[in-house]
UniProtKB/Swiss-Prot annotation:
Family (UniProt): Belongs to the cytochrome f family.
Cofactor binding note from Swiss-Prot or TrEMBL: Binds 1 heme group covalently.
InterPro entries: Cyt-f_TM (IPR024058), Cyt_f (IPR002325), Cyt_f_lg_dom (IPR024094), Cyt_f_lg_dom_sf (IPR036826), Rudment_hybrid_motif (IPR011054)
UniProt protein name: Cytochrome f
Residues involved in heme binding: 31, 51, 54-55
GO terms of molecular function: electron transfer activity; heme binding; iron ion binding
Span of the signal peptide: 1-30
Cofactor: heme
Quaternary structure annotation from Swiss-Prot or TrEMBL: The 4 large subunits of the cytochrome b6-f complex are cytochrome b6, subunit IV (17 kDa polypeptide, petD), cytochrome f and the Rieske protein, while the 4 small subunits are PetG, PetL, PetM and PetN. The complex functions as a dimer.
Cited function: Component of the cytochrome b6-f complex, which mediates electron transfer between photosystem II (PSII) and photosystem I (PSI), cyclic electron flow around PSI, and state transitions.
Keywords: Chloroplast, Electron transport, Heme, Iron, Membrane, Metal-binding, Photosynthesis, Plastid, Signal, Thylakoid, Transmembrane, Transmembrane helix, Transport
Length: 313
């Protein structure tokens, strides 16, 4: 894998986010850089991946890896982020557009994305033009991708290079966990806790709606409380207003629909770093068992022949 510096990596993700967002880095769909800037490590002690802090809806993801791999070999980790590819999400402008996807893959220590010259041609075809980035220089085993066009990348192949305990004394022939976080669509909350326009907006107080003033970027809903105080809730373009003037609402009652069609999911699996000597020993053992079985059959047939000859005599 290329040895990008963290500053270059962050700049690359920022540029990637800009290419997807009309508002640049403020767009919630630029989730990789948000996670990298706000969290030293993407997986909390509870097992929760931090992307779930901004992407509130839960959706399934899946990961497939071989049951066992040999040291210093390249294997595939197939990540699947299923969703309805015909669905449209609310963009930062309030308009509808296609969903983007992204993923964070937390590999065991010592495992990493395989260098280009180590990836077999057939595997490289499956990988395509995916760009893999280290989460940080301190965690080269944590890989992030995205945002990417969902229709093209709702299934991704990560080429993983297994470590060699002979050259890396921190690695052993054991069973290791692999963790996946995968997302489709934009988030509902910014890192500072404020809502994006891909979220439900509720009434801040109980009262009667006295006016709804639509605008190009904001719709202002004015509520009058029982005490006569007027409170204005500003709703960005995107979600649909589901209340009307004169309607009485309770505090926290939805003023809009839920425009979110995406969501975040987690999955985990295991891979065994297999000792080649153990495999060879197992093959030799099975060979001896097979030879013993053959000799047993031959001996049995020889015994049957002796018995038959004695009976004839």
């Amino acid at each position: 894998m290329r040895n990008w510096s963290f500053s270059k990596a962050a700049l690359t993700v920022s540029l990637l986010a800009l290419s997807w967002s009309p508002f640049g880095p403020a767009e919630v769909q630029a989730y990789p850089i948000y996670a990298q800037e706000n969290y030293a490590y993407p997986r909390e002690a509870t097992g929760r991946i931090v992307c779930a802090n901004c992407h509130l809806a839960q959706k399934p993801v899946d990961i497939e890896v071989p049951q066992a791999v040999l040291p210093d070999t390249v294997f595939e980790a197939t990540v699947k982020i299923p969703y309805d590819t015909e669905a449209k999400q609310v963009l930062g402008t309030g308009k509808k557009g296609p969903l983007n996807v992204g993923a964070v893959l937390i590999l065991p220590e010592g495992f990493q994305i395989a260098p280009t010259d180590r990836i077999p041609e057939e595997m490289q075809t499956k990988v395509g033009k995916l760009y893999f980035q280290q989460y940080s220089p301190e965690h080269p085993n944590v890989i992030v991708v995205g945002p990417l066009p969902g229709k093209k990348y709702n299934e991704m192949v990560f080429p993983i290079l297994a470590p060699n305990p002979a050259t890396n004394k921190d690695v052993h022939f054991l069973k290791y966990p692999i963790y996946l976080g995968g997302n489709r669509g934009r988030g509902q909350v910014y890192p500072d806790g404020s809502k994006s326009n891909n979220n439900i907006f509720q009434a801040p107080v109980a009262g009667t709606i006295t006016s709804i003033t639509p605008g190009e970027k904001l719709t202002r809903v004015t509520l009058k409380t029982v005490a006569g105080t007027e409170v204005v809730e500003s709703i960005p373009a995107g979600p649909d207003i589901i209340v009307s003037v004169g309607q009485t609402v309770k505090a926290d009652q939805p003023l809009t629909n839920n425009p979110n069609v995406g969501g975040f999911g987690q999955a985990e699996t295991e891979v065994v770093l297999q000792n080649p000597a153990r495999v060879q020993g197992l093959i030799i053992f099975f060979a001896f068992v097979l030879i013993a079985q053959v000799f047993l059959v031959l001996k049995k047939k020889q015994f049957e022949k002796v018995q038959l000859s004695e009976m004839n005599f």
